[in-house]
Amino acid sequence: MTDEVRRYLRKAEQALDVAEDLLKSGHAPDAAGKIYYAMYYAAQALLKADGGN
């Protein structure tokens, strides 16, 4: 696994952590945005791991 893939996965995990905190405090719309970015970062990691740009 490359450093770039690790960075994207770390960003995805951090976004999910923030989303969880937002949900717990009743901010569902804001959490949805963070979840969107978590999926984006995870997809980027997958593409990079598969050799994509």
Regions found by a protein language model. Give the residues of each.
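Terminal alpha-helical segments
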Residues: 1-53
